[in-house]
Amino acid sequence: SKYNIDAVFVSMQPAKDFCVTSAAVRAMSGKGYILNNAYTTARLLGVIRDAEFVIGMRLHTLIYAASVKTPVIGISYDPKIDAMMDYMGQEYRLPADNPNPLTLQAYIDKIIENRAEISLQLAEVAEKAAEKASENAVLALSLIKE
């Protein structure tokens, strides 16, 4: 409520995420919405692109956020989440089993203050990832031709 931002929860795994997102919306003092229908990738990318920042615990959420240059706070429940946050150069993460609301607020403050810089950093990460994907595609095609 400090920044007058509405929370939109995007469920990448609706069956698993609904209980957690519902509880979060009930606990909020501001507005909260849950998108738990099956959305296309393009639609999800649009929602994430339009966000000020994303709080995500699903790997695809982090990947989508990086690809559209949206700052992200990772909720770490698995080493793959920490690995992706490290790869993206993003320091803001909370443990899933004990997220601290004061730490979360501090992360949100830092992201709001430094959003442009963080987005530029994510743009570089996305560009490098696209280059690696292209190199891998060329390598895969060369292996198929052999």
Language-model features, listed with the residues they occupy:
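Active-site anion-handling motifs in enzyme catalytic cores
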Residues: S1-E146
